C-alpha cells in the first residue's frame, strides 16, 4: 500500500480513484495531480514506481491543503465566525442550519434527535 499525505491508499484501484481517499482531494484535483506528474489515467497504484509515488506526494504537499491541515483550517474558520458573533457564527454556536434552511420542521440532522416534551398529549 502506498502512503500519501498520511493515508494508506488502496493498491488495486486506479490512481485517480485512489487519490480521492485523501481528505481534500476530489475527482478534479486527482485528475490535475496525475496530469501534472504525467501518469496515465488507467494506471493502477500497484503499477506505480517509487519515483512516481514520490512525485505525487511532492505535488500534493506543494500545491494542496489536505487531511489534518484542511480539517484544522475549516474548524478555525468556523471558530472565527463564532468569535465574531456574526449571524453564521451564532447559527454554528446554536447548532442550527447555517445556510437559511427552515427549522420549524426538518433540520433533524443538524439539531439532533427530537427531545420529547413532558406533559404533551394528543
Curated annotation (Swiss-Prot):
<dbReference type="GO" id="GO:0005829">
    <property type="term" value="C:cytosol"/>
</dbReference>
<comment type="function">
    <text>Located at the top of the head of the 30S subunit, it contacts several helices of the 16S rRNA. In the 70S ribosome it contacts the 23S rRNA (bridge B1a) and protein L5 of the 50S subunit (bridge B1b), connecting the 2 subunits; these bridges are implicated in subunit movement. Contacts the tRNAs in the A and P-sites.</text>
</comment>
<keyword id="KW-0694">RNA-binding</keyword>
<protein>
    <recommendedName>
        <fullName>Small ribosomal subunit protein uS13</fullName>
    </recommendedName>
</protein>
<dbReference type="InterPro" id="IPR010979">
    <property type="entry name" value="Ribosomal_uS13-like_H2TH"/>
</dbReference>
<comment type="subunit">
    <text>Part of the 30S ribosomal subunit. Forms a loose heterodimer with protein S19. Forms two bridges to the 50S subunit in the 70S ribosome.</text>
</comment>
<comment type="similarity">
    <text>Belongs to the universal ribosomal protein uS13 family.</text>
</comment>
<keyword id="KW-0687">Ribonucleoprotein</keyword>
<dbReference type="GO" id="GO:0006412">
    <property type="term" value="P:translation"/>
</dbReference>
<dbReference type="GO" id="GO:0019843">
    <property type="term" value="F:rRNA binding"/>
</dbReference>
<keyword id="KW-0820">tRNA-binding</keyword>
<keyword id="KW-0689">Ribosomal protein</keyword>
<dbReference type="GO" id="GO:0003735">
    <property type="term" value="F:structural constituent of ribosome"/>
</dbReference>
<feature type="region of interest" description="Disordered">
    <location>
        <begin position="94"/>
        <end position="122"/>
    </location>
</feature>
<dbReference type="InterPro" id="IPR019980">
    <property type="entry name" value="Ribosomal_uS13_bac-type"/>
</dbReference>
<dbReference type="InterPro" id="IPR001892">
    <property type="entry name" value="Ribosomal_uS13"/>
</dbReference>
<dbReference type="Pfam" id="PF00416">
    <property type="entry name" value="Ribosomal_S13"/>
</dbReference>
<dbReference type="InterPro" id="IPR027437">
    <property type="entry name" value="Rbsml_uS13_C"/>
</dbReference>
<dbReference type="GO" id="GO:0000049">
    <property type="term" value="F:tRNA binding"/>
</dbReference>
<keyword id="KW-0699">rRNA-binding</keyword>
<dbReference type="GO" id="GO:0015935">
    <property type="term" value="C:small ribosomal subunit"/>
</dbReference>
Amino acid at each position: 500500500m502506498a502512503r500519501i499525505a498520511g493515508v494508506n491508499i488502496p493498491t488495486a484501484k486506479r490512481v485517480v480513484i485512489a487519490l480521492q481517499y485523501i481528505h481534500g482531494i476530489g475527482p478534479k484535483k486527482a485528475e490535475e495531480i496525475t496530469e501534472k506528474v504525467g501518469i496515465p489515467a488507467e494506471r493502477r497504484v500497484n503499477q506505480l514506481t517509487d519515483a512516481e509515488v514520490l512525485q505525487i506526494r511532492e505535488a500534493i504537499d506543494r500545491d494542496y491543503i489536505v487531511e489534518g491541515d484542511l480539517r484544522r483550517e475549516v474548524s478555525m474558520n468556523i471558530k472565527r465566525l463564532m468569535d465574531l458573533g456574526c449571524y453564521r457564527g451564532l447559527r454554528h454556536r446554536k447548532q442550527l442550519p447555517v445556510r437559511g434552511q427552515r427549522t420549524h420542521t426538518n433540520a433533524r440532522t443538524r439539531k439532533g434527535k427530537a427531545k420529547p416534551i413532558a406533559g404533551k398529549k394528543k
